[in-house]
């Protein structure tokens, strides 16, 4: 991750997860994202749930993550 502005750690972590999802050559699993992002399991799953709820990421039936429809529309 890059420089963190005080009070924005959650936002920065969410951006890092979105970047990791977008950068993978194949849709990453949660295990892939744990390695790529260096977050704890509870933190990663909380972020993924939030991103899914906002339509910024989506989970496939195979358990992989893709950019969500709202993210693609930006």
Task: List the predicted regions and their residue ranges.
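N-terminal helix-turn-helix
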Residues: 1-74
């Amino acid at each position: 991750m890059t420089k963190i502005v005080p009070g924005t750690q959650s936002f920065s972590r969410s951006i890092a997860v979105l970047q990791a999802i977008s950068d993978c050559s194949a849709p990453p699993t949660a295990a892939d994202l744990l390695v790529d992002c260096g977050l704890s399991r509870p933190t990663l799953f909380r972020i993924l749930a939030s991103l899914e709820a906002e339509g910024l990421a989506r989970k496939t039936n195979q358990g992989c993550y893709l950019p969500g429809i709202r993210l693609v529309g930006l």
